[in-house]
C-alpha cells in the first residue's frame, strides 16, 4: 500500500514537471496488473448496485438527463468538435458550448466513493497517436498470427507508453465491467479512478440510449498515466493499465 501511495504521489508531481518524466523506481512499482485495494467488478449485478448509488448521489435534473441521454446517442457530435478545438470550448459554436457546460455540470454531480477500475475498449487506430510507435510498427502489429499479437511489438509499445501521460480532449466513455459492451476491439484501456473522481454512471434507461453497457462517463480533458502495456494470456488482447488524475 505504501509503494502504491508513493507511485500516485510521483505521478501527481510528474504532471506539473513533465509529461514524460517519472522516476524509474516508480515505473517498476507500476507494473502490477491489478491493485488489490482497488474495486474491480466482475459481476453485473454488483456493478449495477454500486453504480446506482452514484445516480442517487447525483440527483440529476430533467435537463441533466436529457443532456446525458442525447450524448450517448451520438457522442461524436460533442467529442468531434472538442478534439478539433484541442479541448478549448471557446472555439465551439454557442449551441455546442451550452451542451458541453451542461455535461460538465452533470458529470460533476457524482464522485467515486472508493478507487475503482473502469475499462475502455479501443481499436488499433488508437495507437496512431502514440509517439514512438511508428506506422510500420502498427502495420506489423495488425498482421496477427491467428488473432495473436506479436509480443515484441507489444513490448515496444510498453516501452514507449510506460509512465507517459495522455489526455483525452473529449469525454471518455468507459465500462464498469470488463467486456460488458460490444467486443471486437483488441485494446482494453484499464483505468484506475482514485477515490473522489468525478464520474457519471449511465446504466439507466433515462440516462443512456444503450442500456446494459455499464457505461461510466468521465469528464472531458481526462488525463491518465500509463503503468504497463501487456498481452492477455491468449495474446489476443492488448491491455493498457493506467491511473487517472482526479479532476
From Swiss-Prot:
| UniProt cross-references to Gene3D superfamilies, sorted A to Z | Toxin ADP-ribosyltransferase, Chain A, domain 1 (3.90.176.10)
Question: So which domain of life are we looking at?
Answer: Bacteria
Active-site residues from the entry = 120, 173, 215
Q: Does the keyword Transferase apply?
A: yes
All copies of domain TR mART core, residue ranges: 39-247
The similarity annotation says:
To ADP-ribosyltransferase C3 of Clostridium.
Q: How is this protein named in the record?
A: Epidermal cell differentiation inhibitor
**Record EC number:** 2.4.2.-
Q: What's one GO-annotated cellular component?
A: extracellular region
User: Which keywords label this protein?
Assistant: Glycosyltransferase, NAD, Nucleotidyltransferase, Signal, Transferase
MF terms (GO), sorted A to Z: NAD+-protein mono-ADP-ribosyltransferase activity; nucleotidyltransferase activity
Which species is this record about? Staphylococcus aureus
Identify the CDD domains for this entry: VIP2
The region annotated as signal peptide is 1-35
Q: What does this protein do?
A: Inhibits terminal differentiation of cultured mouse keratinocytes. In culture, also inhibits the differentiation of human keratinocytes. Probable ADP-ribosyltransferase.
Heme listed as a keyword: no
* Pfam families (UniProt xref): ADPrib_exo_Tox (PF03496)
Amino acid at each position: 500500500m505504501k509503494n502504491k501511495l508513493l507511485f500516485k504521489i510521483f505521478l501527481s508531481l510528474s504532471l506539473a514537471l513533465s509529461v514524460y518524466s517519472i522516476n524509474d523506481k516508480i515505473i517498476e512499482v507500476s507494473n502490477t496488473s491489478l491493485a488489490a485495494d482497488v474495486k474491480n467488478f466482475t459481476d453485473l449485478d454488483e456493478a449495477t448496485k454500486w453504480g446506482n448509488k452514484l445516480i442517487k448521489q447525483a440527483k440529476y435534473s430533467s435537463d441533466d438527463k436529457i443532456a446525458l441521454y442525447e450524448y450517448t446517442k451520438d457522442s461524436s457530435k460533442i467529442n468531434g468538435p472538442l478534439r478539433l478545438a484541442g479541448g478549448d470550448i471557446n472555439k465551439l459554436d454557442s449551441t455546442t458550448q451550452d451542451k458541453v457546460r451542461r455535461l460538465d455540470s452533470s458529470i460533476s454531480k457524482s464522485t467515486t466513493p472508493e478507487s475503482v477500475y473502469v475499462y475502455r475498449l479501443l481499436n488499433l487506430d488508437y495507437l496512431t497517436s502514440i509517439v514512438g510507435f511508428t506506422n510500420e510498427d502498427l502495420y506489423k502489429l495488425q498482421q496477427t498470427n491467428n488473432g495473436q499479437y506479436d509480443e515484441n511489438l507489444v513490448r515496444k509499445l510498453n516501452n514507449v507508453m510506460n509512465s507517459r501521460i495522455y489526455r483525452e480532449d473529449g469525454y471518455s466513455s468507459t465500462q464498469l465491467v470488463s467486456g460488458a459492451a460490444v467486443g471486437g476491439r483488441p485494446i482494453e484501456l484499464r483505468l484506475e479512478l482514485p477515490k473522489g473522481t468525478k464520474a457519471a454512471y449511465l446504466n439507466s434507461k433515462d440516462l443512456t440510449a444503450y442500456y446494459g453497457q455499464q457505461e461510466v462517463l468521465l469528464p472531458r480533458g481526462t488525463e491518465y498515466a500509463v503503468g504497463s502495456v501487456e498481452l492477455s494470456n491468449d495474446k489476443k488482447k492488448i491491455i493498457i493499465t493506467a491511473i487517472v488524475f482526479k479532476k
